[in-house]
Amino acid sequence: MDFRELSKLAYDLRKDTVDMIVAGKGGHIGGDMSVMETLVTLYFDQMNISPENMNDPDRDLFVMSKGHSVEAYYAVLAKKGFLDIKEVNEKFSKFGTQYIGHPNNKLPGIEMNSGSLGHGLPVCVGMALAGKMNKKDYRVYTVMGDGELAEGSVWEAAMAGHQYKLDNLCAIVDRNRLQISGNTEDVMGHDDLHERFRSFGWHVIDVADGNSIEQLHAAFEEAKQTKGQPTVLIANTVKGKGSAVMEDKASWHHHVPSQEDRKSTRLNSSHLGISY
């Protein structure tokens, strides 16, 4: 798929995500919408991963560290062929289901249970180090929320990533600047996030528009060429991206959209020039 087709796919999957949250009567919709292009770029443009190679020790590895954005993750996994979207919508967030509100590695395609913030990067450091020790060529990716960076374990892992020169590790910060209690800078300010990661020995790539497939593609390609140190992408995204009523509003961190809200999610893709 080209960049335009991938952008359309991201909006299609936003619709699936909204439908899932409505059916389940709850979900972290704001972060789902902001991270969608990152997930689409990883799964449909970058990573060596498919339902057919999940037992391949050379497959790329992904951990959704900001596990509360699981609805977007489920939608992408379903499109990739790991899950059935109809079943997900029927069972999501229901009593006794495996389709719970955070990633569950009993489901196909999910490497790690996550959602307790600050755990994804430490585990990915271990995965990347194992790859180096076993002389494997796979790459390891994790997506973190910017609010998650208040967890100290993130920075312990960042220090270890530099120590072991894990150039097969790429972290992505979904930098939408909002969390459940408001603006991230008011809750626990990050100062200059780029310089902070650089001070820990990481190669830092600023993605000016983290909802641009083309910019994300270029950033991931640069990360692949970076040697001797891990890479972090600071993806500047918009919480609630794709919906006129949700964009850049902390109140949509966890919310169930109305029928009118669902319509706006599709209408706001008109800039792609693609008819639904």
Report each predicted region and the residues it spans.
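Histidine-centered active-site/metal-ligand motif
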Residues: 28, 68, 100-102, 119, ...
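N-terminal hydrophobic or amphipathic helices/low-complexity stretches enriched
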Residues: 1-13
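Cofactor-binding active-site loop characterized by glycine-rich and histidine/acidic residues
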Residues: 5, 17-20, 32-163
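Glycine-rich beta-alpha junction loops
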Residues: 68-69, 73, 176-177, 237-240
